[in-house]
Curated annotation (Swiss-Prot):
InterPro entries: DNA-dir_RNA_pol_bsu_ext_1_sf, DNA-dir_RNA_pol_bsu_external_1, DNA-dir_RNA_pol_su2, DNA-dir_RNAP_su2_dom, DNA-dir_RNAP_su2_hyb_sf, RNA_pol_bsu_bac, RNA_pol_bsu_CS, RNA_pol_bsu_protrusion
Family matches, as HAMAP family: RNApol_bact_RpoB
Keyword list, A-Z: DNA-directed RNA polymerase, Nucleotidyltransferase, Transcription, Transferase
Known role: DNA-dependent RNA polymerase catalyzes the transcription of DNA into RNA using the four ribonucleoside triphosphates as substrates.
Keyword Nucleotidyltransferase: yes
Gene of this entry: rpoB
Protein name: DNA-directed RNA polymerase subunit beta
A GO BP entry: DNA-templated transcription
Record's keyword annotation contains Metal-binding: no
EC numbers on record: 2.7.7.6
GO cellular component, one term: DNA-directed RNA polymerase complex
Recorded superkingdom: Bacteria
Family: Belongs to the RNA polymerase beta chain family.
Oligomeric form and interacting partners: The RNAP catalytic core consists of 2 alpha, 1 beta, 1 beta' and 1 omega subunit. When a sigma factor is associated with the core the holoenzyme is formed, which can initiate transcription.
Length: 1270
């Protein structure tokens, strides 16, 4: 029974110890772990994720600062339902989030107000499953990571219509206003705030504290200060003034309304800037009473900075106050109430931590770009930042610096799940804190608690709308394990805050040299999203700042560090200007380069260098591709466009009934299955105790410490999924591959099925292929298939459909599930049970009733016949109508499962009986909890025996067991373990770790008991939890067995796709010399123009493998060479390149030319003809135009469009045309008459007027034109 024979593969890789792949789902799992930080004790949590969001929004105080609500900690309880239950019932797999909040009063008048600490329920948060997905309303969804523009400063360049180059610097924050510095055609620099308000840069500089011209010019070291006296002024005659000579004085005047004395600042310009000083200016300057004047320096530097002088010329303000007022007016289009409020507005724009946030990333990027050393905690702009940006921009104008490449991956970062959830929580908490403040202000003098202030709906509504409607929360592609894993590793540049398809140009979509080892250059969709949606490379990781990094080996003096320590992950920025050797450069055993010249890469350049110049080396040749691209053997021989199709089509491969791993693989198939978590894997070393089709039980080995801290038995049971439906209606049907008594190691795969065999990905079937034409049936990529493939179910798949019917309460009364349906024959209801649900095992044909349901009819006046019936049969007859669920026109299959979920509707006596049960449940729980705590205390006493306390504290930092005290049973029993800090109880670090693990395990078990109690209570009082408004929900699962047939789409792994054009009898297929007929005939003309020669390599090697019973791994860019192929074909006794003479199955004669006959791995894709075939008889019509609907889902017709009308006109087929445009379409009267005529066998009536003409006439009448048909 056990097929636990792992596929041993002959590996062609030249690199013998490649780096291990990181966990492929780390992108999702790690991000979510970092968001919740559940494994970290509260006192050690980093200021990150959810904790950070709370910290930013709390404490919350009321307007008078009397009451303060502080945040202490958050925690979550176990989920109410298991993942499977949520999938079955259409629920969300979530955990209750609770926060410990402290409310205290700072006002001495409220002496009666005590400090309150409470646990407050904040609503459910969807919780990530171990597979990296979320279950939302019963469907598995994935939150895709977003690739967006990193916060920071960007320098760009554009060209004006007149040819002038314009430069700009844009500062993009995480939150807050955008500010852009840009030059115009007159060489003046402006600052744009939020892309609309424009002001000279110097005005902004004055507003932030560089008040007069002197301060501004000193920043750039542009002017010379001259003390005003005759001697000095005579020396500078002939030089230009760098700043205005201003006479400043204050005037007092009385405000007539208030009687206050107000002083106002007055400025008078004596001599304007850029004026050349002459003799007659000297007296003017001395008379004006100024102390100093500024003149231009005589150095060359000032010509670079001419833009600053030009900008000063345009600057309307002369002092900080004027600048502030000017900016305020620009922003608000109104005058400020007073100076302070104007300053406040400017301060809030860039310097307020509440309103502006660069984020850690933004600060890091700005420091890096401008060479600053500002502290990473400063998340707002500083004056220094603004000055340095202006200086850099001026360097740019003078061609002394370069503009940024916006598509460089150091300028783009990834928002993973955790960060997206943090942003949503921040929105929710901000809304909640507003309502908290309002409630605090209202409840001024009464006593209230944190619970009274908080409305849990606020957060959950934001989170639910994110998971339900956000473009990045997607219905998981669950066609096969590869599709799942690829979807979780996908990076999208679309979505909120990202690009839009229409606006994205060519550059953003293109492959960039920084994608090397980070984003796959091959795997991206064809069509409008090309290049905007990409996949993470196999070795890539996302670092704390959200930049994608890739691993390299360190190289020093021509020697590569081949140890595990020699690997370092670098971001695109850190990799700049480094010389990197290729992954397959030959090395000796010590890690030295064998050749004197090494092919290397430096940014976008590929120099050949000497070994001592190399700084880094790729860890593997597979580094540049994603998982899907790495699965294509001989990828190096395929054109990239076809490889793209290949990697996209492997995700559409349908899981087959009989899985078979490829003979020619790439070696990544095993890791993919392990990391996809679709199979059951051993969690540790142990022994299989029991195994059958639905269950595996394993007894795990545990060491003494693990046994001691655990509250769970060592025996673990796993349920094997049977015929489970996936999102795409595929089947997950696993079977065990282990035997009773077998020893297993950690990570061993214990099952197979769902595109998996022997622990490896198995998407298709190894088929014997001949590349030759066959009677024209493989013209244009069509595929000729041997009947054996159909007969032996080689490409057969099972699909499961789920049909749901909900029972609601309507205005006219309750709906009801029943097999007693009015006006339906007994024959039609023979397979229904008493609830009206079809029995398991029934064969379903189109039109059969799956679930019977009746609905109360509307009360209308009964007809005479109905009155008679009611008089005879009582009132019940005829007031319900049939609302059953029937099989759709193309549905044929077998019922494999049915489920019924009901809410409990109870009478008063039943409710009273329940009340008696509930206290018993509580007592049971208390008893179990007490036992559990006793075990904990016993174990803690063992651990703390003879130890002295180092000071056990609760979460507030209060000592509950004093430092230096001995641990006693009484002390340990008195502790509330939910609020105790678990670090440093004793001086023994090992014992501390054990204490932490023990208490954490205890709390987990305690919460599980608590959750179980709640569930039992819920089941008694309410019944099955169902979505709102639904009383019962019936589900029927129907399995369809799909054999491959004409019209189905098949493909190889190299982008070689085609449609099955004919299934040929086995004896008519071309056969080999030994009489073996080939399984599939492909057109050789599909190869040369497509340039995917990899398929030929695969076919040749595959045939050698099949003959010898060997499997191969040929990793991409490091796989089998031509010589290796020849060596293996020789071993197998096959001709070179497998060129073989075939015989015609029909005549038995040998063909003239030899053809390539090999074994290729072929996939059956999810575009099956059975899902697409469709014919309409009589069906629904569109309401207004009265034309038939379109599409299979609506049981619609085929569109006969404008061009088709021309074709019939060209043939002069007037009667057919008239028929098509009237009675077959929208002549309402005509079509019913035609039906009548067909039934009675009479000749067809003449067609009438199409409804579309009436629609047109009505529209014209609506415009006020009186139109009548004569």
């Amino acid at each position: 029974m056990s097929s636990n024979t792992e596929n041993q593969r002959v590996n062609f890789a030249s690199i013998k110890n490649p780096m291990k792949y990181p966990d492929f789902l780390e992108v999702q799992l790690k991000s979510f772990q970092d968001f919740l930080q559940l494994d970290t004790p509260p006192e050690k949590r980093k200021n990150d994720g959810l904790y950070k969001v709370f910290a930013e929004n709390f404490p919350i105080a009321d307007t008078r600062n009397n009451f303060v609500l502080e945040f202490l900690d958050y925690y979550i309880d176990p989920p109410h339902y298991s993942i499977d239950e949520c999938l079955e019932r259409g629920l969300t797999y979530s955990v209750p989030l609770k926060a410990k909040l402290k409310l205290y009063c700072t006002d001495p008048d409220h002496e009666d107000f005590d400090t309150v600490i409470q646990d407050v329920y904040l609503g459910p948060i969807p919780y990530m499953t171990p597979k990296g997905t979320f279950v939302i309303n019963g469907a598995e969804r994935v939150v895709v990571s977003q690739l967006h523009r990193s916060p920071g400063v960007f320098f760009g360049q554009s060209v004006h219509a007149n040819g002038t180059k314009l430069y700009s610097a844009r500062i993009i924050p995480f939150k807050g206003s955008w500010i852009e510095f840009a030059t115009d055609i007159n060489n003046v620099m402006y600052a744009y705030i939020d892309r609309k308000k424009k002001l000279p840069v110097t005005t902004l500089l004055r507003a932030v504290g560089f008040e007069n011209d002197k301060d501004i010019l000193e920043i750039f070291n542009l002017a010379e200060d001259v003390k005003v006296n005759k001697t000095n002024l005579k020396k500078v005659v002939g030089r230009k003034l760098a700043a205005r000579v201003l006479k400043t004085w204050t005037e007092d005047f009385v405000d007539e309304d208030t009687g206050e004395v107000v002083s106002i600042e007055r400025n008078e310009v004596i001599i304007d800037r850029e004026t050349v000083i002459e003799e007659d200016h000297i007296d003017e300057i001395i008379d004006s009473g100024v102390q100093n004047i500024l003149v231009h320096k005589e150095e060359a530097n000032s010509s670079d900075y001419s833009i600053i002088f030009n900008t000063l010329q345009k600057d309307p303000s002369n002092s900080e106050k004027e600048a502030v007022l000017y900016i305020y007016r620009q922003l608000r289009n109104a005058d400020p109430a007073d100076d302070a409020s104007a300053r406040e507005v400017i301060n809030n724009l860039f310097f307020s931590e509440k309103r502006y946030d660069l984020g850690e990333v933004g600060r890091y990027r700005i420091n890096k770009k401008l060479g600053l050393t500002t502290d990473m905690d400063v998340k707002v702009l500083t004056k220094q930042d603004i000055i340095e940006i202006i200086k850099y921009l001026i360097e740019l104008i003078n061609s002394k610096a370069d503009v940024d490449d916006i598509d460089h991956l150091s300028n783009r970062r990834v928002r993973t799940v955790g960060e997206q959830l943090s942003n949503q929580f921040a929105i929710g908490l901000a809304r909640m804190s507003r309502t908290i403040r309002e409630r605090m202000n209202v409840r001024d003098n009464e006593v209230f608690t944190p619970i009274d202030l908080i409305n849990a709906k606020t957060i959950s509504s934001v989170i639910n709308s994110f998971f339900g409607t956000n473009a990045l929360s997607q219905f998981m592609d669950q066609t096969n394990p590869l599709a799942e894993i690829t979807h979780k590793r996908r990076l999208s540049a679309l979505g909120p805050g990202g690009l839009s398809r229409e606006r994205a140009g060519f550059e953003v979509r293109d492959v960039h040299y920084t994608h090397y080892g980070r984003l796959c250059p091959i795997e991206t969709p064809e069509g409008p999203n090309i290049g905007l949606i990409s996949s993470l490379c196999v070795y890539a990781k996302i670092n704390e700042l959200g930049f994608i990094s890739t691993p390299y080996r360190k190289v020093a003096d021509g020697k590569v560090d081949i140890s595990d320590e020699g690997i370092e992950y670098l971001t695109a920025e850190e990799e700049e200007d480094k010389i990197i050797a290729q992954g397959n450069a030959p090395l000796d055993d010590e890690g030295k380069f064998v050749r004197e010249k090494v092919k290397a890469r430096r940014d976008a350049d590929y120099p050949v260098v000497t070994p001592d110049q190399v700084e880094l080396m790729d860890v593997s040749p597979q580094q540049i591709a994603s998982i899907a691209a790495s699965l294509i053997p001989f990828l190096e021989h395929d054109d990239a466009n076809r490889a793209l199709m290949g990697s996209n089509m492997m995700r559409q491969a349908v899981p087959l009934l009989r899985t078979e791993a490829p003979i020619v693989g790439t070696g990544i198939e095993k890791q993919l299955v392990e990391d996809s978590r679709t199979q059951i894997a051993a969690e540790g070393d142990g022994v299989v105790e029991y195994v059958d089709a639905t269950t595996i039980r394993i007894l795990y080995d545990r060491n003494e410490d693990e046994e001691f801290v655990s509250f769970e038995p060592a025996l673990k049971e796993y349920r094997i999924p049977k015929f489970r439906k996936t999102n795409q209606s595929m089947t997950i049907d696993l079977r065990p591959t282990c035997d009773k008594g077998q020893r297993v190691k950690k990570g061993d795969i214990l099952t197979e099925g769902y595109s998996t065999q022997g622990g490896e990905l198995a998407l298709g079937k190894n088929l014997l292929v001949a590349y030759m034409p066959w009677k024209g049936y493989n013209y244009e990529d069509a595929i000729v298939l041997n009947e054996r493939v159909v007969r032996e179910d080689l490409l057969t798949s099972v699909h499961v459909d789920e049909y749901i019917l909900e029972v609601r309460e309507t205005k006219r009364g309750m709906e009801e599930l029943t097999s007693d349906i009015p006006n339906v024959s007994e024959e039609a209801t023979k397979d229904l049970d008493e609830n009206g649900i079809v029995r398991v095992g029934a064969r379903i044909e189109p039109g059969d009733i799956l679930i019977g349901k009746i609905t109360p009819k509307g009360e209308s006046d009964p007809s005479p016949e109905e009155k008679l019936l009611r008089a005879i049969f009582g009132d019940k007859a005829g007031d319900v109508k049939d609302a059953s669920l029937k099989a759709s026109p193309s549905l044929r299959g077998v019922v494999i499962d049915k489920k019924l979920f009901s809410r409990v509707i109870k009478s008063r006596s039943e409710k009273n009986a329940d009340k008696a049960i509930l206290p018993k449940l509580n007592d049971e729980f208390e008893e179990k909890a007490a036992k559990l705590k006793d075990i904990l205390i016993e174990k803690l006493l063992v651990l703390t025996n003879g130890k002295v306390s180092q000071g056990v504290k609760d979460y507030l930092g209060t000592e509950v067991i004093a430092k230096g005290a001995k641990f006693t049973k009484r002390d340990l029993e008195s502790l509330d373990y939910t609020i105790i800090q678990l670090s440093k109880w004793t001086a023994d670090a090992h014992k501390n770790d054990m204490i932490r693990d023990l208490v954490m395990n205890y709390l987990k078990k305690y919460k599980e008991l608590d959750a179980e109690l709640k569930r039992k209570k819920f089941a008694i009082t309410i019944g099955d939890e169902l979505p709102a408004g639904i009383i019962q929900m019936a589900k029927v699962y129907i399995a369809k067995k799909r054999k491959i047939g004409v019209g189905d789409k098949m493909a190889g792994r190299h982008g070689n796709k085609g449609i099955v054009s004919r299934v040929v009898r086995q004896e008519d297929m071309p056969f080999l010399a030994d009489g073996t007929p080939v399984d599939i005939v492909l057109n050789p003309l599909g190869v040369p123009s497509r340039m995917n020669i990899g398929q030929i390599f695969e076919a040749v090697l595959g045939r050698a493998g099949k003959e010898l019973g060997v499997k191969f791994a040929t990793p991409i860019f490091d796989g089998a060479s031509m010589d290796d192929l020849n060596e293996w074909t020789d071993k197998a006794g096959l001709p070179r390149y497998c060129k073989t003479y075939l015989c015609d199955g029909g005549t038995g004669e040998r063909f003239d030319q030899p053809a390539t006959v090999g074994v290729t791995y072929m996939l059956k894709l999810g575009h099956m003809v059975e899902d697409k075939m469709h014919a309409r008889s009589i069906g629904p019509y569109s309401l207004i135009t009265q034309q038939p609907l379109g599409g299979k889902a609506q049981f619609g017709g085929q569109r006969f469009g404008e061009m088709e009308v021309w074709a019939l006109e060209a043939f002069g087929a007037a009667h057919i045309l008239q028929e098509i445009l009237t009675i077959k379409s929208d002549d309402v009267v005509g079509r019913s008459k035609a039906y009548e005529a067909i039934v009675k066998g009479e000749p067809m009536p003449t067609p009438g007027i199409p409804e579309s003409l009436n629609v047109l006439l009505h529209e014209l009448r609506g415009l006020g034109l009186s139109i009548n048909l004569e």
